[in-house]
């Protein structure tokens, strides 16, 4: 082996050893938090999984038995599950899309505001600081016929909360109003990392505001965008409060979380309710996995390229 080859091999081994040492350090730093998380969450998840494999109804406590995947079969062949899943996915897709567009616009405004920047940020974040149930009731009363200021704008005898599509539209509005500030806050953090010199150089080169946004700003804040979309998608998929207050899940407006609540706390069916919660957990895990695979290193937990 020549001296050049020896130096090359030494450099490769050095980089490999450095990477392994870096990963060992990362595992050591993460281990305490990971162990605490496992200790707190492993038992509830495991117990829910165990209950999902049993016929367990509190109304008939003496009729408990292990039935394997029977509860999952019952759920997956039932139209109520698929209706609730479709409603959940529709609310998630529409609300997160609108929140991203509005959140990006608000983030750009807050980032560029020169006077009263703190006041603008505080005003934008107020809706996010309101308890979801309180905000939901404010929307509920606003759309109640006869007393609601928004319902009074509609034709006489209109009751939007008694119809599926109008109800889902109101749920989306409530979601967007409440959580757009969260989206804008995450995107604002990403905008702070965009070099002003780069934007000025693009402007000098004749790039329009739209091209600076699409060719410079958005690519550079991609990690912040992915984090914001991932967190909001997972949160929106588990929607419960707004639907529970506004419609109670009636008229085919219930989400998968509402379906689980109805089976567990209204029907006292611990087995079916636990199975639904496990399915929700599985759906959330699949969504997170898809985000990581689609966006790679930009997604939380993604593997950096070349590593």
Curated annotation (Swiss-Prot):
Quaternary structure and partners: The complex is composed of two ATP-binding proteins (SugC), two transmembrane proteins (Suga and SugB) and a solute-binding protein (LpqY).
Family of this protein = Belongs to the binding-protein-dependent transport system permease family.
Cross-referenced InterPro entries, in alphabetical order?
A: MetI-like, MetI-like_sf, Sugar_ABC_transporter
- Name of the protein described by the UniProt record: Trehalose transport system permease protein SugA
Where does it live in the cell? Cell inner membrane
Where does the ABC transmembrane type-1 domain start and stop, copy by copy?
Answer: 85-291
What processes does the entry annotate via GO biological process terms? biological process involved in interaction with host; transmembrane transport
Functional summary from the UniProt entry: Part of the ABC transporter complex LpqY-SugA-SugB-SugC, which is highly specific for uptake of trehalose. Involved in the recycling of extracellular trehalose released from trehalose-containing molecules synthesized by M.tuberculosis. Trehalose uptake is essential for virulence. Probably responsible for the translocation of the substrate across the membrane.
Swiss-Prot/TrEMBL keywords? Cell inner membrane, Cell membrane, Membrane, Sugar transport, Transmembrane, Transmembrane helix, Transport
One Pfam entry name: BPD_transp_1
Which ranges does the record mark as transmembrane?
A: 25-45, 89-109, 123-143, 168-188, 217-237, 272-292
Q: How is this protein situated with respect to the membrane?
A: Multi-pass membrane protein
- Organism, by scientific name, is Mycobacterium tuberculosis (strain ATCC 25618 / H37Rv)
List GO terms (cellular component aspect).
Answer: plasma membrane
């Amino acid at each position: 082996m020549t001296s050049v080859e020896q130096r090359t091999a030494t450099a490769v081994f050095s980089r490999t050893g450095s990477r392994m040492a870096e990963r060992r350090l990362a595992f050591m730093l993460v281990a305490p938090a990971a162990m605490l998380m496992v200790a707190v969450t492993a038992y509830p998840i495991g117990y829910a999984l165990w209950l999902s494999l049993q016929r367990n109804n509190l109304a008939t406590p003496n009729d408990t038995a292990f039935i394997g995947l029977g509860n999952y079969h019952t759920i997956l062949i039932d139209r109520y599950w698929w209706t609730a899943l479709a409603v959940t996915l529709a609310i998630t897709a529409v609300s997160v899309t609108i929140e991203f567009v509005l959140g990006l616009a608000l983030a750009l405004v807050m980032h560029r505001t020169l006077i009263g920047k703190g006041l603008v940020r505080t005003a934008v974040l107020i809706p996010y600081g309101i308890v979801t149930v309180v905000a939901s009731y404010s929307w509920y009363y606003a759309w109640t016929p006869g007393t609601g200021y928004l319902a009074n704008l509609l034709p006489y005898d209109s009751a939007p909360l008694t119809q599926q599509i109008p109800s889902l539209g109101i749920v989306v509005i409530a979601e967007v109003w409440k959580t757009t500030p969260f989206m804008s806050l995450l995107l604002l953090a990403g905008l702070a990392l965009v070099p002003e010199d780069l934007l000025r150089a693009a402007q000098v080169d004749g790039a329009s505001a739209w091209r600076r946004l699409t060719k410079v700003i958005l690519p550079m804040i991609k990690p912040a965008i992915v984090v914001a979309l991932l967190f909001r998608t997972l949160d929106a998929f588990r929607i419960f409060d707004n639907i529970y207050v506004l419609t109670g899940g009636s008229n085919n407006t219930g989400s998968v979380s509402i379906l689980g609540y109805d089976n567990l706390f209204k029907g006292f069916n611990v087995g079916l309710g636990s199975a639904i919660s496990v399915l929700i957990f599985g759906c959330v895990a699949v969504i997170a996995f898809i985000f990581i695979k689609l966006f790679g290193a930009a997604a939380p937990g993604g593997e950096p390229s070349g590593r």
